Amino acid sequence: MFLLYFRLGFQHILPLGADHVLFVVGLFLASTTLPALLWQVSAFTIAHAITLALATTGVVHVPPSIVEPLIAVSIAAIAVENLVERAFHWRRPLIVFGFGLLHGLGFGGALQALGLPPEDVLVALLGFNLGVEAGQVAVLASLALAVGWCQGAPWYRRRVVVPASAAIAVVGLYWAIQRLA
């Protein structure tokens, strides 16, 4: 049971979760140090674990018609912040925590759609959540291998962060409009 839901959680990120992948890419781009990245990823993880559990167990219900456009807006917002802020700021993990709450509602909706075994809700929830985390770690590791070597370069912001964040913002806004239609 655990492994089945772990796999489903991983697949919700890779290959099915382009929106969540872009959000994680946005976090990575603005994090030129490991501590900055860890603060943000930890805030995101804690937040989405909370709302994933609340949504999956039926304690909280927010319709996908509200959650999905807001997730897209969160992607655009984190990318725009990457364009505006030149350095890591203490409020960034708080913002990421708030956005993580939204993403957790999205994960919860996906998990509810898959169905939960009544006798193993906690095992399924834990497996799915850890699968999501493993997917995010895979994305971050891939990014570290691809561009981590140049994060300290003087041209990194101009040549990597700005164009990639601009593209992510455009995609996030497009998805928001598409999900509202």
Segments predicted by a language model, with ranges:
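Membrane metalloprotein/metal-transporter helix-bundle signature
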Residues: 1-181
